[in-house]
UniProtKB/Swiss-Prot annotation:
A motif (HXXXXD motif) lies at residues 115-120. The gene is vps66. GO terms for biological process: lipid storage; triglyceride biosynthetic process. It is a single-pass membrane protein. It is found in: Lipid droplet; Endoplasmic reticulum membrane; Golgi apparatus membrane. The chain crosses the membrane at residues 32-52. This is Putative lysophosphatidic acid:oleoyl-CoA acyltransferase. InterPro entries: Plipid/glycerol_acylTrfase. It is an enzyme of class 2 (transferase). It catalyses: a 1-acyl-sn-glycero-3-phosphate + an acyl-CoA = a 1,2-diacyl-sn-glycero-3-phosphate + CoA.
Length: 300
């Protein structure tokens, strides 16, 4: 394990970038038969549902943009179908704290979400009418991206995801308010294995003082469907060898408002950490990029 020391958090000993392997049964037993049967059924269903999602996102959704409620219904239904085909048999959501008058989630609000799997995109698309935004570690500006583009970007190094037409978060939130969507931000900027929260990018620095930020934590059980190391084959293997998995969501009912926070980034990190009952490590996006670079050169 010495070769992993560089990418372990010195304070907690947690390695947030190391993949979690799928547990497979030893020897030949009934569970293997079940896995094979589920795999035979799941492969064609996944192919069909992904194809439908692709056709909808690329061709039909732009046409139905004039009917936002119908568009969201189809988006939500296809996302839920995909999750079901991938093996999600239970999706539960709980709320921490209680809403006060006027504090319920509204168009233009910002969701700060931990990032550990491509499935995060489907989970959020299933629950909310979303505008996804990409965070940059060098600037507080963010760039709008489609749900499908964000999903597929999880299978490539974060360095390949180019930040284009970046805008302050305040402008993105204002645009989302006009079109009736909420802004989805993954402030860590990278995928982890879900064992800890990484350092946040400075994306919240460009938020308006009156913008409302709602932390939301997504947890996968078992955690083998997380994807800290981008690989379509690894993800497919994990999904096919996992008979079923559960998704648990914890949502903070009390929004963070920048003007009420000494440091909104630190406050968001603290609340998200409490929601997920996870530690905050000192590693960040630059550490993830160096880890992937070393891994590609077979240094790990």
């Amino acid at each position: 394990m010495e070769k992993f020391t560089r990418w372990r958090d010195p304070g907690t000993g947690i390695a947030p970038f190391h993949p979690i392997n799928t547990e497979t049964p030893s020897g030949f037993n009934f569970k293997w038969i079940l896995i094979v049967v589920v795999m035979i059924l799941r492969v064609p269903l996944c192919i069909i549902s992904v194809t439908l999602w692709f056709l909808w996102s690329c061709f039909l959704k732009p046409i139905l943009s004039i009917q936002p409620k119908l568009s969201f219904f189809i988006d939500s239904s296809l996302s839920r179908l995909l999750l079901l085909c991938f093996g999600c048999l239970k999706l539960s959501k709980s709320t921490s704290g209680s809403f006060v008058q006027g504090d319920s989630l509204q168009p233009g609000d910002i969701l700060a979400v931990n990032h550990s799997s491509p499935l995060d995109v489907l989970v959020l698309s299933c629950l909310y009418n979303c505008t996804f935004a990409v965070c940059d570690s060098k600037t507080s500006n963010v760039s709008i991206i489609s749900a499908q583009a964000y999903f597929w970007s999880c299978f490539f190094s974060p360095s390949k995801l180019k930040i284009t037409d970046a805008k302050p978060l305040a402008k993105v939130a204002a645009k989302a308010s006009k079109i009736g969507t909420v802004v989805i931000l993954f402030p860590e900027g990278v995928c982890t294995n879900g064992r800890a929260l990484c350092q946040f990018t400075p994306c919240f620095d460009s938020a308006k003082e009156t913008d409302r930020i709602f932390p939301l934590y997504i947890k996968y059980l078992p955690p083998c469907v997380t994807l800290p190391v981008p690989s379509l084959l690894s993800f497919a293997r994990s999904v096919l060898l996992t008979v079923s998995f559960e998704i648990r969501i914890r949502f903070s009912a009390e929004p963070l408002i920048p003007r009420n926070c000494t440091d909104v980034t630190e406050s968001a990190q603290e609340v998200l950490s409490k929601l997920g009952r996870s530690r905050v490590v000192k590693l960040g996006k630059s550490d993830k990029l160096s880890y992937l670079d070393a891994r590609s050169k077979k240094h790990v």
